Structures are given as structure tokens and as C-alpha cells.
Amino acid sequence: MLCFWRTSHVAVLLIWGVFAAESSCPDKNQTMQNNSSTMTEVNTTVFVQMGKKALLCCPSISLTKVILITWTITLRGQPSCIISYKADTRETHESNCSDRSITWASTPDLAPDLQISAVALQHEGRYSCDIAVPDGNFQNIYDLQVLVPPEVTHFPGENRTAVCEAIAGKPAAQISWTPDGDCVAKNESHSNGTVTVRSTCHWEQSHVSVVFCVVSHLTTGNQSLSIELGRGGDQLLGSYIQYIIPSIIILIIIGCICLLKISGCRKCKLPKSGATPDIEEDEMQPYASYTEKSNPLYDTVTTTEAHPASQGKVNGTDCLTLSAMGI
């Protein structure tokens, strides 16, 4: 849901951040001669996107009257770095300064402003420019804040839900939805100061098919991303029709092909099995012929062997019996 206070808050931050977008500082040699009207101390919060160039300006004081210019840089967790320029000797001096990306914008006698070539998260901190002149001291103080654009992802979830995520942004991104839904947001802070925001929303209304996730951040403005919702039971039915039915049809086709192959193989084997009895019958023919031919011999041999065994007992009845057997 879009909230007015969130939108206003973003707008205010953008206005504060305009200063960081300046590419040049006022010409110190064209400032008013009456420096008494200049504020002695100015505090400014500066927002710079990571990877961009930052330019921090000293007070608009005529350099012809400058005695000493000093930049004091206090980064988180580090000792203060001091960069100074002495006008009478034109000497520069550095103390506890190791970051080579932080330098003078030009030669100090022409432009004592400070520049950071590529802003990183470790450059967050306090930057102070002090200018000493015969009339007093003037100071510009900057609280430098680094902006990190988040990586945005969005995707549909289950049961008519949608997820929108802004990963590792600084400051934390704001996420809203159109139309409104039942939403839950979760923030996860990281050790480097960035924040991941994850918003999950659910819509009961079946007529809502497309929703919009709006991600608001200082570096990117408002991004509107569309997400197509699933249709619950209709979606399951669609998945069933789309995936399951074609699979079943493919299985049926494969089964029919297998059955046709099996049936064809059986038909090919049937003539071979029908010819087998003929072969067996042909193989048995010689044995059958031999038996028929050998039976008379067997009978003759049996008769011949029976006659000698009966010769010692031949009498009237036995002779008739033997004669009958011989016939």
C-alpha cells in the first residue's frame, strides 16, 4: 500500500541529496569582500551513490586572505585523517591518510575543495573544512552518507501470492503493492549497513490476475514491476491439462506400439511352429518303415528257433501246432 509519509520522506531525502550532485563549488575569488556576513559554521548531510564521484566544498572565502586550510576526515572505525595547506609557504601536509581516492580537487591555492573519485561504503563519515583568515575561522561540515541501489527481484508464489525483494540496499527500500493485498514485510540488516527488504502478498479475489510491485529507493526512484498471479484450483487444472494428459497420451501411444510389435512377433513365429510336426513326422518315417520290414524277419527267426527246440518232443498234436505256426 502506498503511504504518503513514506513518499514524503523519500522526497526530503532526495532534496538533501541534491547537494551531492553538484559538480563544482563556488569560485572563492568571486565571493563577497564582506566575509562577516558569511556563516562561520555550516552543517550539511550529503548523499552520494556508491561508485559516483563526490565533491565537498570549503567555505566561500576569498583565497587572497586565507592563512590556513585544514580538512579533517573522520571515518567510522579509523583515526582522523588531516590534510592541510599553509598559504604563506604553499606547503601541504597529511597525517594518518591512507586512502588515495580522497584528494584535493585541484591545487589548494586555486581550489581547496576535496573530492572522492569513487565513493564506497567505507567513505561514510564526517568531513570538515576549516579556513583561517584574519577575520576569524569558517567551517563547512559534511556528514557523508553512501547510497547503495538494491538488486530487485520479483516472482509469483504459491496459492495466489507474489514476492518482491529489494536486496542489499542503503537505505532500506520501500515496497508497496497495487492493488492492495494481505502483505507481510521482512527486513534483514547486513554488517555493511545495507538492508534487504522482502515483501510477500496474498490476494483472495479470483478476478485479480496481475499485480504490481512498486520499489522506491533514493538511487532508482520508483520501479513498478508486474507479476502474474496463479489461479489456484484453475491453475492446478491447467497444469494437469498441460503436463499430465500429454504424458498419459504418450504412454498410451508407446503401449500401442509395444503391443503391435509383440503381435507381429507372434504372427512371425506361428508358421514355424506349424511346420514342426511335419518335420517330426518325416523324421519318424524311417523308423516306421524299418519296423514294418523287420516284423516278418522277426517272426521267421522266432519260428526257426522254435522248431529245433521242439524236435525231441514231436508227436501228432505238436506237429500240427508247429505246422500251423509255420503257416
UniProtKB/Swiss-Prot annotation:
Compartments it resides in: Cell membrane
Intrachain disulfide bonds: C58-C129, C81-C97, C164-C213, C183-C201
Ig-like V-type domain location: 26-145
Cellular component GO terms, alphabetical: cell surface; external side of plasma membrane; receptor complex
InterPro entries attached to this UniProt entry: CD200R, CD80_C2-set, Ig-like_dom, Ig-like_dom_sf, Ig-like_fold, Ig_V-set
Cytoplasmic side: 261-327
Tissue: Restricted to cells of the myeloid lineage.
GO term, biological process aspect, one: negative regulation of T cell migration
Transmembrane regions: 240-260
Signal peptide: 1-23
Domain Ig-like C2-type residues, every copy: 147-226
Predominant location: membrane
Membrane topology: Single-pass type I membrane protein
This protein's UniProt keywords: Cell membrane, Disulfide bond, Glycoprotein, Membrane, Phosphoprotein, Receptor, Signal, Transmembrane, Transmembrane helix
Record topology, Extracellular segments: 24-239
Glycosylated residues, chain numbering: N29, N34, N43, N96, N159, N187, N192, N222
Family listed: Belongs to the CD200R family.
Classification via PANTHER family: CELL SURFACE GLYCOPROTEIN CD200 RECEPTOR 2 (PTHR21462:SF2), CELL SURFACE GLYCOPROTEIN OX2 RECEPTOR PRECURSOR (PTHR21462)
Quaternary structure, from the entry: CD200 and CD200R1 interact via their respective N-terminal Ig-like domains.
Protein name: Cell surface glycoprotein CD200 receptor 1
Lineage: Eukaryota, Metazoa, Chordata, Craniata, Vertebrata
Underlying gene: Cd200r1
